């Protein structure tokens, strides 16, 4: 599979860490590490913004999606507050990961911990076309559990 080349700036507090990387041959997301100076403890029900120590320059027409790691959610109840988070092509600041602890125990984020995944995806920009009505479908306006069995 062909890829795109993306410029990445490592910030001073990134030193000694790994760039985001794919952890298996066909992984869609690259794991992102925490660039914390000291351990960060996230108590149950609390949130923390975790620095990554990197900034990226995405090409026009692409976004980076910051997604939870399933293992953190399953084992610790830790996920992202805004999942997925979107990094726009014109953003040049440090990428931060906003974690929340839904678990019962404090969660410790150590330097170099893999805290999220980054997926690079194409973006489709739309032009709206207002209409007084929409084409009818079998589903219609059924949503929020409309396919649940009674």
Swiss-Prot record:
Q: Which InterPro entries match?
A: dUTPase, dUTPase-like, dUTPase-like_sf, dUTPase_trimeric
| Pathway assigned to this chain's UniProt record | Pyrimidine metabolism; dUMP biosynthesis; dUMP from dCTP (dUTP route): step 2/2
Q: Which cofactor does it need?
A: Mg(2+)
UniProt entry tagged with the keyword Methyltransferase: no
Molecular function via GO: dUTP diphosphatase activity; magnesium ion binding
Enzyme Commission code(s) on record: 3.6.1.23
Q: Which CDD domains match?
A: trimeric_dUTPase (cd07557)
Residues binding substrate, per UniProt: 69-71, 82, 86-88
UniProt enzyme class:
hydrolase
Q: Which GO terms describe its biological process?
A: dUMP biosynthetic process; dUTP catabolic process
Instruction: Please verify whether the record's keywords include S-adenosyl-L-methionine.
Output: no
Keywords (alphabetical) are: Hydrolase, Magnesium, Metal-binding, Nucleotide metabolism
SUPFAM superfamilies assigned: dUTPase-like
Q: Which reaction does it catalyse?
A: dUTP + H2O = dUMP + diphosphate + H(+)
> Cross-referenced HAMAP family, in alphabetical order?
dUTPase_bact (MF_00116)
The text of the family note is: Belongs to the dUTPase family.
- What exactly does this protein do? This enzyme is involved in nucleotide metabolism: it produces dUMP, the immediate precursor of thymidine nucleotides and it decreases the intracellular concentration of dUTP so that uracil cannot be incorporated into DNA.
Q: What is this protein called?
A: Deoxyuridine 5'-triphosphate nucleotidohydrolase
Per the UniProt record, the lineage of the source organism begins with:
Bacteria, Pseudomonadati, Thermodesulfobacteriota, Syntrophia, Syntrophales
């Amino acid at each position: 599979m062909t890829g795109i080349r993306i410029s990445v700036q490592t910030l001073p507090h990134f030193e000694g860490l790994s760039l985001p990387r794919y952890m298996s041959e066909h992984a869609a997301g690259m794991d992102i590490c925490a660039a914390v100076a000291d351990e960060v403890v996230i108590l149950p029900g609390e949130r923390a913004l975790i620095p990554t120590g990197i900034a990226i320059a995405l090409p026009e027409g692409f976004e980076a999606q910051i997604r939870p790691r399933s293992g953190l959610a399953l084992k610790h109840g830790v996920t992202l507050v805004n999942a997925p988070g979107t990094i726009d092509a014109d953003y040049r600041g440090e990428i931060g990961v906003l974690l929340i602890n839904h678990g019962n125990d404090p969660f410790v984020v150590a330097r170099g911990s893999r805290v999220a995944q980054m997926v690079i995806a194409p973006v489709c920009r739309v032009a709206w076309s207002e209409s007084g009505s929409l084409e009818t479908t079998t589903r219609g306006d059924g949503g929020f559990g409309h396919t649940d069995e009674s």
